[in-house]
């Protein structure tokens, strides 16, 4: 979607803008869980899934490559930062592998449709839902292979439904507003 605003810019400018936005989204993915845990306690991450929204935004705004990158880097950077700076890893080491795969899928799948969302921002609603289903399917498959029971996994999915609903509303709303702003800016140039 940011390509809309960068159509007349050089490749170097496009890459610089996309890299900057990606870094900001990774920082957001590290910061939002900290805020959620400070407000809602230890279970807030599982309920609100705050690290997932920046990957969805990255995919929709920047495309699949950047969405995948933000999705993979977010839990890794969060793990490293919280381990070194706070002394308590978040996500926990046992959760890191599936979160890398799951959040990476969120960014990848939402990014596969970024060009279509740019043309018709209303499509961001089904795109976010598809990315969420894909990511949760990866979560389920990975953890079943790792030997966790379906019942405990289903409980985890149900716990995160509040966050999924919130993302399904907020991410498309942000995409629609940004698309309108970018189109308005493009017309005024």
Residue ranges of model-derived segments:
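Membrane-embedded alpha-helical hairpins and interfacial helices in multi-pass inner-membrane proteins
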Residues: 37-45, 83-100, 112-189
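Active-site-flanking alpha-helical
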Residues: 70, 109, 170
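Hydrophobic alpha-helical membrane segments of integral membrane proteins
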Residues: 68-73, 126
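Residue-level recognition of pore/gate-forming positions within transmembrane alpha-helices
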Residues: 26-30, 74-76, 132, 136
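Hydrophobic transmembrane alpha-helices
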Residues: 2-66
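Juxtamembrane loop-helix boundary motifs flanking transmembrane segments in multi-pass membrane proteins
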Residues: 1-11, 121, 149-153
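Alpha-helical transmembrane segments of multi-pass membrane proteins
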Residues: 52-56, 99-107, 164, 168
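Interfacial segments of multi-pass membrane proteins
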Residues: 62-66, 77-82
């Amino acid at each position: 979607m940011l390509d809309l605003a960068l159509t007349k810019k050089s490749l170097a400018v496009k890459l610089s803008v996309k890299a900057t936005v990606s870094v900001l989204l990774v920082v957001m993915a590290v910061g939002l869980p900290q805020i959620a845990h400070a407000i809602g306690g230890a279970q807030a991450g599982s309920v609100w899934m705050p690290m997932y929204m920046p990957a969805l935004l990255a995919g929709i705004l920047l495309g699949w490559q950047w969405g995948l990158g933000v999705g993979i880097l977010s839990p890794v950077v969060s793990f490293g930062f919280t381990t070194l700076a706070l002394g308590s890893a978040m996500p926990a080491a046992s959760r890191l592998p599936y979160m890398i795969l799951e959040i990476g899928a969120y960014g990848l799948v939402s990014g596969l449709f970024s060009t279509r969302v740019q043309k018709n921002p209303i499509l961001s609603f089904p795109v976010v839902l598809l990315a969420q289903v894909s990511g949760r399917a990866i979560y389920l498959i990975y953890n079943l292979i790792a030997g966790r029971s379906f019942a405990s996994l289903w409980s985890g999915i149900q716990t995160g439904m509040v966050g999924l609903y919130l993302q399904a509303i907020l991410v498309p709303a942000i995409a629609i507003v940004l698309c309108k702003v970018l189109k308005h800016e493009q017309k005024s140039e």
